[in-house]
């Protein structure tokens, strides 16, 4: 009998919750991927979305490595299987120095101090850098498991709230 892994159970719950938000008209799903990396024997699920009338995006990334998958399937003693969770927000900025300070305040207000939050700026060579892409990674420092399934709806509400707060900073046309 097939017994789904923690990764598979979390993926199904995330996917269902995100598509429910899409169906209700709160967001629009713009991309989805479910990958198996044969070189590292890992799995990654990602779903990207934006507000219905927005341009900023949020991407939920759920991943599990070989040790997590094997530890769970082979029932290794002392194994602590689970999944890594990251949420990545992306937007285009003008005047990044001032905007990033404000965005950092917004992110800390919404997400507290629990996850690590890193903003990475990039721009095309030859442009002056006044307009750049900001990728904000919210990374949780511990693995998640089936015990956190009830928290998924609230986590997605946080992503929608974050998108609303970031949208005024987005200058992408």
Regions found by a protein language model. Give the residues of each.
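Short, extreme N-terminal leader segments that mark the start of a protein/domain
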Residues: 1-24
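N-terminal interaction modules that seed assembly of large macromolecular complexes
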Residues: 16, 20-75
């Amino acid at each position: 009998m097939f017994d789904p892994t923690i990764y598979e159970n979390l993926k199904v719950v995330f996917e269902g919750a995100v598509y429910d938000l899409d169906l209700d008209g709160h967001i629009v799903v713009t991309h989805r991927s479910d990958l198996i990396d044969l070189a590292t024997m890992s799995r990654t699920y990602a779903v990207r979305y934006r507000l219905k009338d927005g341009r900023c995006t949020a991407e939920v990334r759920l991943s599990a490595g070989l040790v997590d998958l094997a530890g769970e399937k082979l029932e290794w003693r002392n194994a602590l299987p689970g999944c890594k969770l990251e949420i990545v927000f992306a937007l285009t900025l003008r005047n990044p120095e001032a905007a990033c300070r404000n965005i950092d305040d917004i992110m800390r207000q919404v997400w507290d101090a629990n996850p690590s939050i890193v903003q990475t700026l990039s721009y095309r060579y030859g442009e002056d850098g006044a307009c750049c892409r900001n990728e904000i990674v919210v990374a949780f420092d511990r693995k998640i498991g089936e015990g956190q399934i009830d928290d998924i709806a609230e986590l997605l509400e946080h992503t929608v709230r974050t998108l609303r707060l970031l949208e005024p900073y987005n200058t992408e046309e």
